[in-house]
Structures are given as C-alpha cells and as structure tokens.
Amino acid sequence: MADVQPTTPLAALSDAARTALGVAGPSVVRIGRAPGRGCGVVVAPDRVLTNAHNLRDGTTAVTFADGRSVQATVVGGDTDGDLVVLEVDTGEAPVLDWAPTLPEPGEVLFAVGRTGDGGDRVTFGIVSGRERAFRGPRGRRITGSLEHTAPLPRGSSGSPVVDGVGRLIGINTARLSEGFYLALPADAELRHRVEALVRGESVARLVLGVGLAPAEVARQLRASVGLADQPGLLVRTVEDGSAAARADLRVGDLITGATGRPVTTLDDLHAALDTVRASRRLDLQVIRGAEAIAVAIAFDEAAS
C-alpha cells in the first residue's frame, strides 16, 4: 500500500488558487476592445459590475470567458464611488457568489482577471491592510478599501478579489506603489449599492452648488481684511438656484462645521453630505464676517 503524503502548505495554496480560478474565472469579463481597459464580474443575470473609470461613455464591449464579445450599456452608475453596472447578455456565465465575511490582515486572497487576449489570470497575495483611502475618478475620497499584495497588471481594475473557494471579497480598483493594490470591500454596504445599480438606480450625491477656497487660502483672505484666523472652507461662488442659494449661503461665508463636526477640508464636507443623503438636510456652522451663524441647507429631488 502506497504511503499517503501529507498535504504541504504549498500544495494547499496551489489547490486553493486552482479552486478560486475555477469558480470565479467564468464570471470574470474583459471590458473594452482588445487589449481592453479593465475587467468586470457578473453579479446578476445580464448584469456586469466594473469600475466607472473603465468606461469612456455609456457603452462598451464585454468579452466573456467563452470568447463571446457583446456590446453592453450602462444601466446604473455611481461615478464618485467608481462603480457602474452594465446590462449585457451574460449567456452561461455564472453569477459570482459573495463571501459572508471579509478577510483579516494576513489572510491569503486571490485576484482573478482576464487577459487582453481573453485568457484566465490568477495571482495570490495577502490582505496587507484595511480601511485604506484613495481618490475616485472625480477626486472624491473613497474610504474603507481593502489593501492587498496579489500582483495585478495594468488593465485589471474591476476584476474580483476572491477567497480560497472563489467567493467575492473585493473589487480591484486602484494601484498603490511598490506592489500594493486597493479593492472596494465586498461588504454589506457595497452589496446594497450594487443591488441598487443592478436595478438601474444610479447613485447621486447631494450638491451644494458652491465654489470653495481651501482652508489655507481662506486664512489668507480673512487676514487680508482684518478678520480672525478660523479653520474652514471659504465660499467663493454660489450658483443661482442651487441649494446653497436657497438657504442664503453667501460669498465670503466661512464653513467651519457640518452636522456638528468640524469642516477643514473638502473631504470633511463630502463626508457630511453623504451622511444626510436620506434626510436631504444639511446643517452648516458658518462664520459670516465675525458672527457665527447656522445655515440649514434643504435639498430638493433635483439637487442630487
């Protein structure tokens, strides 16, 4: 009777890589004509998720694992969150399952992609960090990202990061220097957003309708007219008919807080706007000249 060799860690890793590719690979697509601009993943029948920055307009070619190349159109988008869902005939391509939990730092994961000529690609790495941030395609700060070390060539954004049994744990979105990559984590919040995009419900952010000067410029301008130094964002312009105009926010006002939290950067203001998307009311703390006042911004349905 032959001796049964124990499974080595390397053999177990190889088995997991093959499983990850075998399960997730058929769900991964190439975005754009060869060599392509990125990748995507089937998240529902006739629906493909990818990064918004992979598209130049509302249509694109999608190439599946079986070699089919089909024209797709955007059905739902979240440009600030760098996500779009495409409507396309997915044929026999399976929907990729979501992992029930996210991996912890140090855990192994696999990046699955599709090459420019339509072939499979799989690499492995570890979770090197969580709660990382980067800038989206329109400059807004995207937080909560999963940092990992699975190598990815250019043109891999939109591809999935999966666990050892091929379940979705993230969407590759940004590249850092020296071998680190960022993925949007496949958590409950992302799943909720993706399900809305699948239904054709594009995500829109609330817009104040103002032009702002950063804190350092605001300090200099206030000092030039003899006003006290105060951290905040200075209102330089107010658009006619905007939510800010209706609330009588004025040129020269200094926004120092929103929803009870300090505002010293544009990221602070964007974060506050995101928290009031449901209530559609933003309470600002403002310095007008030397006087501290409160300004309540009410957004109508057309303001997003």
Model regions and ranges:
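Active-site region of chymotrypsin-like
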Residues: G25-S27, V84-D97, R121-F180, L184-H192, ...
